[in-house]
Structure formats: structure tokens, C-alpha cells
């Protein structure tokens, strides 16, 4: 893979920073009404590219493919609300965190059984494949269905096909602002 200095020189020589993100996780990275990629991670990565004197080029990918693409050299960086874990830190370099996410548990309004993470034992959730949300749900005894987007998760929850889901509190709040029903 080369040293960090070699990678930086290659990025600057190419004139572009290839940034991987999901593009489907509001408010972090998503498409607005005009189908323009926007969001907090988009703004952060634009600022990084500007500081490097290059243009950002975005590649949208499912969560479970982000690290594989980085490993294969298809991307220069992932800018997608990645939680720093001991296991990931063995392989990847991280910036100082630019955002902190609190994990929230969401259930249907008519669900009185699940109030805490401990109540997930024996229940079904849906979460992004290979995410820390998936790992957390499994650690509390939930059966987890792997999916690609928060939108899909909410649809499964609304249809009663899962009992609960875990995700960033800010993502749930943002979703509820856009979809108050």
C-alpha cells in the first residue's frame, strides 16, 4: 500500500481524492431533492480535499463494501460515520473523530415489549451488514437481518417484519423530521 507520504503524493499528483460513502444515510450522506449528493460527511470530505488541493470524487457503496474497497485500493478514504474500534484500528488509520453518534433503539409505537437493549433477547432486528449496530444487537441476543440502508430498515419495522432496529439517534431524528408519520 505504501507509506502515508507516498499515498498523499499519489493523491495530489492525480488531482483527486476518491472518497467512499454510503450516500443513503441522512444526514451524513444522501441525495437531496435534485439528486445531488449532500450531507455532513460530504462537507467534511470536501474540506479535506480542498486542504489537499485536490477535487473530491465520490463513490457510493453499501456499508459492508466500504472497507473491502479501501483494502483493494478503489478508494483513498472512507468518510461515512465509521466507529473507531480496536479491531479496525489494527488495520486502518483514523482522524480525530469529527462527530459522535449515540446509538438509539427504535421500535413501532405499538411495541410495549422493547424498552432497553436487554429486551432485544429473542427479538428480530435489521441493521447494516458488518456494522457496530449489528454487533450490538447480536450481543444482546437479537437475531439480526442484514440490510443495506436505514430506509429499508424503517420499512421493515413499519411493516412489522422486524421487532426493532438500532442506528444513530441523529439519523432517526432526521428521518422523523422528513417522515413524521
Where are these regions (language model features)?
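Short secondary-structure boundary segments
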Residues: 23, 82-83, 109, 129, ...
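Alpha-to-beta junction loops
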Residues: 17-18, 53-55, 71-80, 123-124, ...
Amino acid at each position: 500500500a505504501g507509506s502515508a507520504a507516498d499515498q498523499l503524493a499519489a493523491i495530489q499528483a492525480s488531482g483527486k481524492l476518491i472518497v467512499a460513502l454510503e450516500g443513503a444515510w441522512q444526514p451524513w450522506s444522501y441525495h437531496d431533492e435534485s439528486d445531488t449528493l449532500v450531507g455532513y460527511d460530504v462537507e467534511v470530505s470536501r474540506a479535506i480535499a480542498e486542504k489537499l488541493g485536490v477535487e473530491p470524487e465520490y463513490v457510493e457503496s453499501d456499508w459492508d463494501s466500504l472497507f473491502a474497497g479501501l483494502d483493494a485500493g478503489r478508494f483513498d478514504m472512507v468518510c461515512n460515520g465509521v466507529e473507531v474500534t480496536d479491531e479496525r484500528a489494527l488495520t486502518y488509520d483514523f482522524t480525530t473523530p469529527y462527530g459522535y453518534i449515540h446509538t438509539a433503539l427504535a421500535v413501532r409505537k405499538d411495541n410495549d415489549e422493547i424498552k432497553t437493549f436487554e429486551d432485544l433477547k429473542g427479538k428480530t432486528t435489521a441493521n447494516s451488514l458488518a456494522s457496530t449496530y449489528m454487533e450490538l444487537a447480536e450481543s444482546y441476543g437479537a437475531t439480526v437481518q442484514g440490510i443495506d440502508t436505514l430506509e429499508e430498515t424503517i420499512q421493515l419495522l413499519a411493516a412489522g417484519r422486524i421487532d426493532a432496529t438500532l442506528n444513530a439517534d441523529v439519523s432517526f431524528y432526521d428521518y422523523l423530521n422528513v417522515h413524521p408519520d
